[in-house]
C-alpha cells in the first residue's frame, strides 16, 4: 500500500485538465501511441465536443519513479462544472491528493476555488500546477500570487507544465509521489468501498466505480449497498488502465470497478457504501446524500406520435444519469410530454442535446423553473415545480423560493456592472474581497432569477471574464405571484410563470409584447393578455389579416360597400369562435428573454 497514490485533477473548464490526464496516461504507458486520442477519459461524444467532463472516470497507471521504485497511480478524473459539484466531492473523497490545475495565462476562476475548498475541507493534499506555460501570454508569477491570495495555499513551488507539449509532466508525477500520502486502510477490517460513479453497460448491467477504504473484495462475494439496502452477487472486479482489466481482488486503498449484474442505476447511487453481506461494516462512510434536482423543464415531442420514443429515450438516458428525474405531464397547448428535473442549466442543456443527437428527437422545451415551497392555510407544506400547478391564492399562506449563495470572481474594472446585474436579480450582497486584480463577490440570489439568463448576462457584462459558482442555501418566504398568459381568453399553461410582485407588471407587459411579435397573424383578431389571478395587467392585439373586399366596387352607393364590410366582419367573428391559435416554439423561449433590456 505504500506504493499506491490516489489523486484527482481539479480545474476550471478549459484549463487543460483532460489534456493533462491524456499526457499522464501516455507517459505511464496506459495506452500505446496508436490508441492515444484527444481526451481519452471523456468517452461520451458530447463530452469531447463541448470539451467538458461530465462523468467521473479513472485510470490505474504504473509509473517507475526517478529513484527506481515503481508506483501504482490511480487517476480519478472529475467533472469541473458547477452542476456536477456533488460528483466532484465524491471523487475527492476517494483520493488522498489533488492536482489543482490553473491556466498560467488566465489565472484562478470561481469553480476552481469552490472545488479546491471542497478538497481542503476533506483533508486532501493539494498540489498547484501551472498549465499552458508555453503560451506567450503566460504569467506564472502573477498566477502564483493569485493562488496564494485567493485560495490561500502555498504555491511558490507550484509545478510548471504544459500538457500540450508534454513539458513538466514527469515533474507532476514526481510531486504526486513525494507530496501525496499513501492511502490508509486496513485490509483485515470489514469491507468498506465508496461508489465514486456508476453507469450502465449494455452487456453486463451497472458498472460501479469504487474506492476500497477497508477490507478486500473478491468475485463470488455477496455485497450489500448500504444506502439502497440491496444485496447482489459480485461477479467480477477489476481496474481501468483506461481499458478494463479484470483482477482477482480489490483490496484497501485501491480504485477499481465492480460488476454484479445490477439492472438499474437507482440501486447503485454515487456516494453509497459497498460492504459484504456476511461481514458488514458497522456504519457507512460519511457524506452520502440524495441528489435533488434544482431546475425543472417540460420536454414535449413536436410530433405527438413520438411520445413513446421520447419515453424510451429518457429511460435509456436515466440508466446512465441517476440525477435525471422525469414524470409524464400533459399540457393543453403542447399535448403529452414529460416534466424533467435537472441538476442545473448545463445538465438540462446536455440532456436535451443528447436526446436530439443520439435519439433523433424533435423537442419543444418549456422555460426552466425551480421548486417552490408553498405553505397552505391549513399549515401543510407542498413543493411545486410547475407554475401551472400552483393552488388557488386564497388557500396559500406564503410561497418560499430557493435561495442560492453565488460566488463570483471578476476583474476589478467590471465590478460595477456585475453588482448592478446582481441587484437587478434581487441579490443581497454578503461579502466583497479584493484579491490582486480580481474581486470576489458573494451574493444571495433567488435561484429562479439565476436559471433564466443570469449566466449569459454575467458573461456579457464582464466581457467573459467573470466566473460563477453557486450552491443551494435555503427556502425563503417572498412576495411571489403567478403570471398567466391568456390568448383569446384561454390560459396557456406552458407559458405561466411565478414572478416577484415588484417586477410582475413589467414582466407581464414585456411578455405580452413579445407574444404579439412572435405569434403569426391569423384570419381573425387575437387578444394576448397577461393576468395575475383574475386581474388583467397587460393586453396586446394581433390584428387580423383581411382581404380588401371593396376592390371590385367602383363608385356606387356607400350601402353597397357597407354590406360587404359587414359580411366580412360577421365571417371573422364566426371564425374567431371556432379558430384556434398555433403557438410557435419561439414563443415558449421568449419567456427566457424577458427583462434583457
UniProtKB/Swiss-Prot annotation:
GO terms for cellular component: plasma membrane. Keywords: Cell inner membrane, Cell membrane, GTP-binding, Hydrolase, Membrane, Nucleotide-binding, Protein biosynthesis. Gene3D superfamilies: 3.30.70.240, Elongation factor 4, C-terminal domain (3.30.70.2570), Elongation Factor G (Translational Gtpase), domain 3 (3.30.70.870), P-loop containing nucleotide triphosphate hydrolases (3.40.50.300), Translation factors (2.40.30.10). Its main location: membrane. It is an enzyme of class 3 (hydrolase). It comes from the Bacteria. GO terms for biological process: positive regulation of translation. It catalyses: GTP + H2O = GDP + phosphate + H(+). Its EC number is 3.6.5.n1. GTP binds at residues 14-19, 131-134. SUPFAM superfamilies: EF-G C-terminal domain-like, P-loop containing nucleoside triphosphate hydrolases, Translation proteins. It is found in: Cell inner membrane. The keyword Signal does not apply. It holds the Pfam family GTP_EFTU. Belongs to the TRAFAC class translation factor GTPase superfamily. Classic translation factor GTPase family. LepA subfamily. Required for accurate and efficient protein synthesis under certain stress conditions. May act as a fidelity factor of the translation reaction, by catalyzing a one-codon backward translocation of tRNAs on improperly translocated ribosomes. Back-translocation proceeds from a post-translocation (POST) complex to a pre-translocation (PRE) complex, thus giving elongation factor G a second chance to translocate the tRNAs correctly. Binds to ribosomes in a GTP-dependent manner. NCBIfam families: lepA, small_GTP. HAMAP family: LepA (MF_00071). This is Elongation factor 4. It comes from Nitrosospira multiformis (strain ATCC 25196 / NCIMB 11849 / C 71).
Amino acid at each position: 500500500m505504500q506504493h499506491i497514490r490516489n489523486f484527482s485533477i481539479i480545474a476550471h473548464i478549459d484549463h487543460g485538465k483532460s489534456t493533462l490526464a491524456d499526457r499522464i496516461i501516455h507517459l505511464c504507458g496506459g495506452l500505446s501511441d496508436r490508441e492515444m486520442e484527444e481526451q481519452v477519459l471523456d468517452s461520451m461524444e458530447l463530452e469531447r465536443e463541448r470539451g467538458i467532463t461530465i462523468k467521473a472516470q479513472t485510470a490505474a497507471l504504473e509509473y517507475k519513479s526517478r529513484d527506481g521504485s515503481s508506483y501504482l497511480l490511480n487517476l480519478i478524473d472529475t467533472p469541473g462544472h458547477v452542476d456536477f459539484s456533488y460528483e466532484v466531492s465524491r471523487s475527492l473523497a476517494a483520493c488522498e491528493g489533488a492536482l489543482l490545475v490553473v491556466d498560467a495565462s488566465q489565472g484562478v476562476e470561481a469553480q476552481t476555488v469552490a472545488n479546491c475548498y471542497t478538497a481542503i475541507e476533506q483533508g486532501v493534499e493539494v498540489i498547484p500546477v501551472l498549465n499552458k506555460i508555453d503560451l506567450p501570454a503566460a504569467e506564472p508569477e502573477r498566477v502564483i500570487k493569485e493562488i496564494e491570495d485567493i485560495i490561500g495555499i502555498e504555491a511558490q513551488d507550484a509545478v510548471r507544465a504544459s500538457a500540450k507539449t508534454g513539458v513538466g509532466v514527469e515533474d507532476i508525477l514526481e510531486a504526486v509521489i513525494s507530496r501525496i500520502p499513501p492511502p490508509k486502510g486496513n485490509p483485515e477490517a470489514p469491507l468498506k468501498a465508496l461508489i465514486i460513479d456508476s453507469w450502465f453497460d449494455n452487456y453486463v448491467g451497472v458498472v460501479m466505480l469504487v474506492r476500497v477504504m477497508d477490507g478486500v473484495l473478491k468475485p463470488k462475494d455477496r455485497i450489500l449497498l448500504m444506502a439502497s439496502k440491496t444485496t447482489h452477487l459480485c461477479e467480477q472486479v477489476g481496474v481501468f488502465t483506461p481499458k478494463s482489466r479484470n483482477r482477482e481482488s480489490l483490496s484497501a486503498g485501491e480504485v477499481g470497478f465492480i460488476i454484479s449484474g445490477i439492472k438499474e442505476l437507482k440501486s447503485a447511487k454515487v456516494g453509497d457504501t459497498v460492504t459484504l453481506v456476511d461481514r458488514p461494516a458497522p456504519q457507512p462512510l460519511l457524506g452520502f446524500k440524495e441528489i435533488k434536482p434544482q431546475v425543472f423543464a417540460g420536454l414535449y415531442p413536436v410530433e405527438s406520435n413520438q411520445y413513446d420514443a421520447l419515453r424510451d429515450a429518457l429511460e435509456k438516458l436515466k440508466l446512465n444519469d441517476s440525477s435525471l428525474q422525469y414524470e409524464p405531464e400533459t399540457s393543453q397547448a403542447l399535448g403529452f410530454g414529460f416534466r424533467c428535473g435537472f441538476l442545473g442549466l448545463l445538465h438540462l442543456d446536455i440532456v436535451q442535446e443528447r436526446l436530439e443527437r443520439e435519439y433523433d428527437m424533435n423537442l419543444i422545451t418549456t422555460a426552466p423553473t425551480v421548486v417552490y415551497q408553498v405553505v397552505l392555510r391549513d399549515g401543510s407544506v407542498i413543493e411545486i415545480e410547475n407554475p401551472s400547478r400552483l393552488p388557488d391564492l386564497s388557500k396559500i399562506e406564503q410561497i418560499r423560493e430557493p435561495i442560492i449563495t453565488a460566488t463570483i470572481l471578476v476583474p476589478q474594472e467590471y465590478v460595477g456592472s456585475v453588482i448592478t446585474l446582481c441587484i437587478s436579480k434581487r441579490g443581497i450582497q454578503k461579502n466583497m474581497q479584493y484579491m490582486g486584480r480580481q474581486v470576489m463577490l458573494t451574493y444571495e440570489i433567488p435561484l429562479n432569477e439565476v436559471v433564466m439568463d443570469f449566466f449569459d448576462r454575467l458573461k456579457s457584462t464582464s466581457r467573459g471574464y467573470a466566473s460563477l459558482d453557486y450552491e443551494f442555501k435555503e427556502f425563503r418566504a417572498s412576495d411571489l405571484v403567478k403570471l398567466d398568459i391568456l390568448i383569446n381568453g384561454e390560459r396557456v399553461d406552458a407559458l405561466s410563470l411565478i414572478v416577484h410582485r415588484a417586477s410582475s407588471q413589467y414582466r407581464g407587459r414585456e411578455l405580452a409584447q413579445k407574444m404579439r411579435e412572435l405569434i403569426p397573424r391569423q384570419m381573425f383578431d387575437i387578444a394576448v393578455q397577461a393576468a395575475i389571478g383574475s386581474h388583467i395587467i397587460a393586453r396586446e392585439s394581433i390584428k387580423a389579416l383581411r382581404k380588401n373586399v371593396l376592390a371590385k366596387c367602383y363608385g356606387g352607393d356607400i350601402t353597397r360597400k357597407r354590406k360587404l364590410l359587414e359580411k366580412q366582419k360577421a365571417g371573422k367573428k364566426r371564425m374567431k369562435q371556432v379558430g384556434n391559435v398555433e403557438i410557435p416554439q419561439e414563443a415558449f423561449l421568449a419567456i427566457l428573454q424577458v427583462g434583457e433590456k
